[in-house]
């Protein structure tokens, strides 16, 4: 059997062995991935999703209750602040209207002449005020909060639906790709698909490694190394011979029979 036939037989056996190992591994990986994808799809489909009506009812009643309580609290706060301001203004009015009389009484009690109070006059109080609170503001904020919750739920529902759709599309595309390979390349299409996707770049390196470990591969490597050394030695010899012939030519060109050596 020739050297080429040995190399071809070795490569063929290596490819068959590596292909069978990779094919079995990828088939198992494919089965595991299919089972995992199916479980994930079932889990996604069985996830409890609250209904929109329940969310709307909870958000609406909660918002209405919060708005009503805030409205009543604001009205009560306005009433309390108004009562405080009214009592303060009543006190200021009473003090201002009795200022001269109280001054005279104080002078009498002090043993002084009450006529000293004639130069005084009643004061003008500044009054009292409060900052009222708009009771409708709390109700409006509660209504806006309810609307925001509805929109947030719609966004979450859309994102969940999009995620389910993407998962389903990934499974469908994967199954379609495998079926296309099966249909186009026969019973080895599935293995070819996974091999092309995951192991296509590993096979050349594996084959080269196995070839280098085989006796034939070691012989080929040694032959290549010897050829490289011989080629390098031949190049050096050729260069030396060229240098020798050039030196002889220069020597002959400088000598003349009739005139002798030229300087």
Swiss-Prot record:
Family: Belongs to the microviridae H protein family.
UniProt keyword Ribonucleoprotein, yes or no: no
Primary location group: virion
Keyword Acyltransferase tagged: no
Subcellular location: Virion
Keywords associated with the record: Capsid protein, Host-virus interaction, Viral genome ejection through host cell envelope, Viral penetration into host cytoplasm, Virion, Virus entry into host cell
Annotated Gene Ontology cellular component terms: viral capsid
Protein function: Probably triggers with protein G the injection of the phage DNA into the host upon conformational changes induced by virus-host receptor interaction.
GO biological process annotation, one example: symbiont entry into host cell
Lineage: Viruses, Monodnaviria, Sangervirae, Phixviricota, Malgrandaviricetes
Protein name: Minor spike protein H
